[in-house]
Amino acid sequence: MQLKRVAEAKLPTPWGDFLMVGFEEIATGHDHLALVYGDISGSVPVLARVHSECLTGDALFSLRCDCGFQLEAALGHIAEEGRGVLLYHRQEGRNIGLLNKIRAYALQDLGADTVEANHQLGFAADERDFTLCADMFKLLDVDEVRLLTNNPQKVKILNEAGINIVERVPLIVGRNPKNEHYLATKAAKMGHILDMK
């Protein structure tokens, strides 16, 4: 187990009241959180989203990506379901950090795609560690999930880490002229399942 559960509090949102649960990485002290809606106990698979931190999309309303749109849609789907979990995975910029993400954006402004920009900065296309998310699910006593994602790699890694992903639920929202190239690159180079028609 790479994490410990350290704090929780109620979080009222436009979609309803969630329980915010804070986790801390034992080795580094880095923090992550889960938003839990309703009663997630029992044997029925839980609707869930693993949402990686994106300050620009989630808080600054960037149109360069689909992250903020996905965050809002996921919270709405979970509330409609009546129960579910959103894991907020604090690995900004596919885990290259905010400042490197800004540098990657500058390279994209010069014509690189999102994968090429990461490579030019010396990073892999995706540096995230989703095994941390498997630990969060385990600490919430969730072992069967209907995962809101377009990323089959997330499904594979979570399954390998002991979380049974019984269904991949598509979450295709937020397409706009500013992020068409970004989404096309995620589909072509990172294997994301997106209807690009």
Swiss-Prot record:
Active site: 126, 128
Family from the record: Belongs to the GTP cyclohydrolase II family.
Cell membrane listed as a keyword: no
EC number(s) given by UniProt: 3.5.4.25
GO molecular function, one term: zinc ion binding
Record protein name field: GTP cyclohydrolase-2
CDD domains cross-referenced by the UniProt entry: GTP_cyclohydro2
Zinc keyword on record: yes
Keyword field: GTP-binding, Hydrolase, Metal-binding, Nucleotide-binding, Riboflavin biosynthesis, Zinc
Reactions this protein catalyses: GTP + 4 H2O = 2,5-diamino-6-hydroxy-4-(5-phosphoribosylamino)-pyrimidine + formate + 2 phosphate + 3 H(+)
Gene that specifies this protein: ribA
Binding site for GTP: 49-53, 70, 92-94, 114, 149, 154
Alphabetized InterPro entries for the sequence: GTP_cyclohydro_II, RibA, RibA-like_sf
Pathway: Cofactor biosynthesis; riboflavin biosynthesis; 5-amino-6-(D-ribitylamino)uracil from GTP: step 1/4
Cofactor note (record): Binds 1 zinc ion per subunit.
Required cofactor names: Zn(2+)
Subunit-structure text: Homodimer.
Annotated GO biological process: riboflavin biosynthetic process
Binding of Zn(2+), residues: 54, 65, 67
Role this protein plays: Catalyzes the conversion of GTP to 2,5-diamino-6-ribosylamino-4(3H)-pyrimidinone 5'-phosphate (DARP), formate and pyrophosphate.
Cellular component aspect of the GO annotation: cytosol
